[in-house]
């Protein structure tokens, strides 16, 4: 599994402009990610998702996030997430390690 501290830096640089992770955190352009692991796509309470996200029907976990974060628009065509993805598998693993910790505190 990845490095939590490196993952935190990646989150701050590439994700925090649109997402929060803390319990009770506000939705920004993207949804708050608290409780992400084990949740189905398009299910953060109070966030307005595209039909593509709601209908994808997968449960977020290490494997699904690894694939999604490489190329979000390929994994969920029609998502409104404009992020191009993270090509390096090691960086995705670091980010997922951080998300696993930060979205569960």
From Swiss-Prot:
PROSITE patterns given in the database record: CYTC
Pfam family of the protein (one): Cytochrom_C
Keyword annotations: Acetylation, Apoptosis, Electron transport, Heme, Iron, Metal-binding, Mitochondrion, Phosphoprotein, Respiratory chain, Transport
Coiled-coil region(s): none
N6-acetyllysine: residues carrying this PTM: 73, 100
Domain of life: Eukaryota
Gene Ontology terms: biological process: apoptotic process; mitochondrial electron transport, cytochrome c to oxygen; mitochondrial electron transport, ubiquinol to cytochrome c
InterPro entries: Cyt_c-like_dom, Cyt_c-like_dom_sf, Cyt_c_1A/1B
Major localization class: mitochondrion
Residues annotated with N6-succinyllysine modification: 56, 73
Post-translational modification: Binds 1 heme c group covalently per subunit.
UniProt KW Metal-binding keyword: yes
Residues carrying N-acetylglycine: 2
Family per record: Belongs to the cytochrome c family.
Role summary: Electron carrier protein. The oxidized form of the cytochrome c heme group can accept an electron from the heme group of the cytochrome c1 subunit of cytochrome reductase. Cytochrome c then transfers this electron to the cytochrome oxidase complex, the final protein carrier in the mitochondrial electron-transport chain.
Protein name: Cytochrome c
Species whose genome carries this gene: Macaca mulatta
Gene: CYCS
């Amino acid at each position: 599994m990845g490095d939590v501290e490196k993952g935190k830096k990646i989150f701050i640089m590439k994700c925090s402009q649109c997402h929060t992770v803390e319990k009770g955190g506000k939705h920004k352009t993207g949804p708050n990610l608290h409780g992400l692991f084990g949740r189905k796509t398009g299910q953060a309470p109070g966030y307005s998702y595209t039909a593509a996200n709601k209908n994808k029907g997968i449960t977020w976990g290490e494997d699904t996030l690894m694939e999604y974060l490489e190329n979000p628009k390929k994994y969920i065509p029609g998502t409104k997430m404009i992020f191009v993805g993270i090509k390096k598998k090691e960086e995705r693993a670091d980010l997922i390690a951080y998300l696993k910790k930060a979205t569960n505190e």
